[in-house]
């Protein structure tokens, strides 16, 4: 629209301009500044001006509630694809990255068997949501594979920081490297430690030309026969239910853990408070893959725990986007009342979002039946 101007007939007449309210306020401000005789009047006008600009630039205040979640179809819905055969590797790990709707919540799962001393039937479900973060940095992996004649199930959640590329690398390479290790079946714990270190070293070589530092946590669970082996690096977490009680199967790697702080200082590093305790004032976890500028203080050596599956009802593997707002006890209580693993995983993610999680949220639920 063209601006029109009415020229004043004398110097003392007002000039009327069809201008934006902000222009008028700015002119009024300078007029008032040079003509006001009292400091108190100036302060009142200044506060009014600040309030006006705050109101103009604030988001829509009439609709403070978050947008509704877009939900992928449940397994078995009319429009969903048929389930994959449990005899082939199941990889459901990057749907949330490729979605056209960045706010969509994705979920899925399956059912399978493992033969050990006792037959283990398990069902698993996964769910992932970008949530309130600007970008999605979580990846996850579910695999069921035959390794040297032994069926192995793998579940992993990888929470990236400084970008998603480390988490994506782990999704693509960690399990592949593990099952390639000669002693993976015969000495699983030893193989896990060696492969985690190997994968971290190979990633750092690949990262050599990257100007920006990036890293990722890893919370992993392996089902081999009737054994559950958990290995974690960072603050993604694995929690089990035993007789209805929450049992942590991993311990978060935080810089303020006394043993972690001692290890970092012994290696020549330091931790300082910057909103939370951080390694070198930068990273809020004390172990991670990647983070080349913080080696050797931030390591990818996992802590490992083994359990007999027959003593457990289910496990939850999740990124800290869930654990920041849900306690272990709360998560177990929610899953306990939901028999379907996929529905339980979806419920956990939705509950984390509803409770105000500001991070990406990804979780996997695995239910056990031992006969």
UniProtKB/Swiss-Prot annotation:
EC numbers, comma separated: 3.1.3.16
Source organism per UniProt: Arabidopsis thaliana
Biased composition (Low complexity): 85-94
Principal place of residence: membrane
SUPFAM superfamilies: PP2C-like
Name of protein: Probable protein phosphatase 2C 11
Stretches the record annotates as Disordered: 67-95
Keywords attached to this entry: Hydrolase, Magnesium, Manganese, Membrane, Metal-binding, Protein phosphatase, Transmembrane, Transmembrane helix
Record-annotated membrane-spanning stretches: 29-49
Source domain of life: Eukaryota
Annotated Gene Ontology cellular component terms: membrane
UniProt record similarity statement: Belongs to the PP2C family.
Record's keyword annotation contains Ion transport: no
